[in-house]
Design a protein with these regions (language model features):
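Helical catalytic core of nucleic-acid polymerases
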Residues: 56-58, 67-71, 76, 103-116
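Short, amphipathic alpha-helical "recognition" segments used to contact nucleic acids or chromatin
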Residues: 74-88
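Gly/Pro-rich turn-and-neighbor structural signature
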Residues: 9-12, 16-19, 88, 93-151
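Short, flexible loop/hinge motifs at secondary-structure junctions
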Residues: 1-72, 140-141, 147
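Conserved catalytic alpha/beta cores of large enzymes that bind or transform nucleotide phosphates
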Residues: 64, 82-84, 96
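General secondary-structure edge motif
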Residues: 31-35, 61, 75-79, 98, ...
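Generic alpha-helical structural element
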Residues: 4-7, 41, 70, 84, ...
Length: 151
């Protein structure tokens, strides 16, 4: 898969403890799978480590936040999985097959775990929306059925 690399450097070019100069010590890397315009890309984040030449302090940029802690899915890919499942009514087994044809093997259980994690992340929004909807005296709903094909 193609890879994009983002380099994160420490905020200051000098040691935050003593003000001494920093020397390159190494780096930590983390990869995240992302879906961009229906094409998968791996976003590789490299966080360089620097050591102070005077006090041996190690300085490194903080890791960027992820929607799912230590997960490989980026926000665009998670949005695509949820949109396919809930707006386009594409079951997870079919999504798994589609992604497999694009060269990325994502099991149904992995996709299901992502959906569960996203539901937990979105629960405060759901609660706020529920509270807002229930403030009115009337509630209207569309009961148009959606046909689902059996697998």
């Amino acid at each position: 898969l193609p890879r994009d690399e983002k380099r994160l450097l420490p905020a200051a070019p000098c040691c935050p403890n003593c003000g001494g100069s920093l020397s390159y010590l190494g780096e930590d890397t983390a990869e995240q799978l992302e879906l961009m315009r229906s094409a998968f890309r791996v976003i590789r984040t490299v966080r360089e480590k620097h050591a102070c030449t005077q006090c041996d302090a190690i300085v490194q940029a903080p890791a960027p936040s992820r929607p799912i802690e230590r997960g490989i899915a980026g926000p665009g890919l998670l949005a695509r999985v949820l949109t396919s499942k809930y707006a386009e009514h594409t079951p997870l087994y079919r999504q798994s097959e589609i992604y497999g044809r694009q060269g990325v093997e994502l099991s149904r259980s992995l996709l299901s775990g992502w959906v569960d994690a996203c539901c937990r992340l979105l629960s405060p929004l759901e609660e706020a929306l529920h509270g807002y909807v229930m403030t009115d005296g009337k509630l209207h709903a569309d009961d148009t059925p959606v046909q689902v094909l059996l697998p």
